[in-house]
Amino acid sequence: MRVRRLVMLRHGQTKSNADSRMQGQLDTELTDLGHAQAASAAEVLAKRQPRLIVSSDLSRAYDTATALAQRCAVSVSTDKGLRETHLGQWQGLTHSEVDALAPGQRQAWRDDATLAPHGGESRIDVADRSRPVVAKILLNEPEWGADDCDRPVVLVAHGGLIAALTASLLDLPVDSWPVLGGMGNASWAQLSGHGPDAAALGDLRWRLDVWNASAQVSNDVL
């Protein structure tokens, strides 16, 4: 039996975050504050000596991952499976614009993991496409948790994806998924996967160790 630590880090601030604009899979860049947030998170997480860093291929996540990689001499690989929720016709709109377009739907979507914006994904969809990323890491990293169980694999991604993947790994009832609230920019979650030395994803029992941890107190939870 061994314990595998999985850290999931949200990207730093973008202008869309600052403007309460829903990005989804639009490729947006970090602001100056976002770069500073990424550097602060990197300073803390580098001390954990990550064994692997896998990032969404969207710029805001990749640049956040690069800040960490530069501090711990680990290269960054990317996986499209870690992209943010596709928000369909809501992408690029502010919260107010979405509420005017579809009154009540944004709150309903937040409260129900099975709902998706028109042309977009539900949280169930997001979990289904991101779980294989973790399964692939288990296959390709047989020493994960064997040499030093505190050395994590770090996924750098997006708030919606992190919440969906966390809920799925914890095997929460779908109607309880919204209990996981928003994450601040450059904040992270940590899960521990308990299972046999040679394990597939379904063999692990996951526990939530940390949610919305940050190098600094933040009021940007969106």
Q: What are the language-model segments listed below?
A:
Residues 1-4, 74, 88-97, 139, ...:
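Acidic, low-complexity terminal tails and accessory targeting/binding regions
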Residues 7, 13-68, 114-131:
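Loop-to-helix element that buttresses phosphate recognition and phosphoryl-transfer chemistry
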Residues 11, 158:
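Short, conserved phosphate/pyrophosphate- and ester-handling motifs at nucleotide-, phospho-/glycolipid
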Residues 39-106:
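Phosphate-coordination/substrate-recognition cap region in phosphate-metabolizing enzymes
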Residues 50-57, 144-148, 152-156:
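Short glycine-rich phosphate-binding loop at a beta-alpha junction
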Residues 67, 164-168:
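Active-site signature of alpha/beta-hydrolase-fold catalytic machinery across serine-
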Residues 108-118, 215-222:
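Extended, charge-rich low-complexity interaction segments
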Residues 159-163:
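GST superfamily/GST-like fold recognition
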